[in-house]
């Protein structure tokens, strides 16, 4: 048998750290203002593309949920905080700094949701939470099914919010759209704005707004 040898030259290198920022907005709760619900996505992307699905879609979901709540005059019981995280792709610095600040300020975070799986048709949500909390969330399925949510399971929340769970044991939730086309685009040159469907993107925001409303209304 012949031996195949492959030679590869790469020119990647580590550069010195620079300053980045999370972008944070919130709607203050009217009944339990000290209880915080976080909704977010991350700002950065790989340099070979526009980051339209990863994670431009999550950023749009976050902003659209906030816009819709403000547009209808929704007054939450609990504080809803909208976070666009910095540096998810190669360091998780934004998520880590957010959790560290929450711990330092002794904030009470009851739930955190991230959208970081693309802007495709909604399919469900996944959790990092106790079996009891996942079971409680599943009782909401009939309310969300008309809008596309078909499943809720315990396969984990998002990466940016994971430090909240590690440091403060906050229950996590990840938005799960249809995954069939995600790896045609993920970290690839094809992850561009033209490959985002506006209707699918907005359906994701609808489902995220729905579960945030339920957590705000009933707690978690």
Model-derived regions: residue spans:
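Soluble metallo-hydrolase cores and metallopeptidase-like ectodomains found primarily
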Residues: 1-52, 64-71
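Surface-exposed patches in mature extracellular/periplasmic domains of secreted proteins
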Residues: 2-8, 149-156, 220
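Structural recognition of the beta-strand scaffold that forms the well-ordered cores
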Residues: 7, 23-26, 36-40, 81-84, ...
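Soluble non-cytosolic domains of exported or imported proteins
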Residues: 15, 52-60, 74, 89-93, ...
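Metal-dependent peptidase/peptidase-like ectodomains
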Residues: 32, 47, 85-185
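Extracytoplasmic/secreted envelope proteins and their assembly/folding machinery
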Residues: 59, 63-66, 77, 92-99, ...
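His/Asp/Glu-rich mid-to-C-terminal helical/loop segments that flank catalytic regions of hydrolases
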Residues: 67, 71, 182-220
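Phosphate-handling active-site elements
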Residues: 67-80, 107
């Amino acid at each position: 048998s012949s031996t195949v040898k492959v030679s590869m030259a790469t020119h990647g290198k580590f550069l010195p750290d620079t300053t980045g920022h999370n972008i944070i907005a919130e709607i203050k709760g009217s009944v339990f203002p000290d209880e915080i619900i976080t909704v977010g996505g991350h700002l950065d992307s790989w340099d070979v593309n526009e980051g339209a699905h990863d994670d431009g879609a999550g950023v749009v979901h976050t902003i659209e949920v906030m816009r819709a709540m403000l547009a209808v005059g929704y007054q939450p019981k609990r504080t809803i905080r909208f976070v666009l995280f910095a540096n998810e792709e190669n360091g998780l610095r934004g998520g880590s700094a957010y959790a560290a600040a929450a711990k330092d300020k002794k904030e009470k975070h009851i739930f955190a949701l991230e959208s970081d799986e693309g802007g495709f048709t909604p399919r469900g949500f996944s959790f990092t939470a106790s079996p009891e909390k996942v079971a409680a969330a599943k009782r909401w399925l009939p309310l969300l099914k008309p809008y596309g949510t078909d499943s809720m399971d315990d396969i984990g929340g998002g990466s940016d919010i994971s430090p909240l769970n590690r440091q403060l044991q906050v229950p996590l939730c990840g938005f799960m759209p249809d995954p069939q086309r995600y790896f045609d685009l993920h970290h690839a040159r094809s992850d561009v704005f033209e490959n985002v469907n506006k209707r699918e993107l907005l359906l994701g925001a609808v489902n995220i707004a729905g579960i945030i409303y339920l957590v705000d209304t009933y707690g978690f």
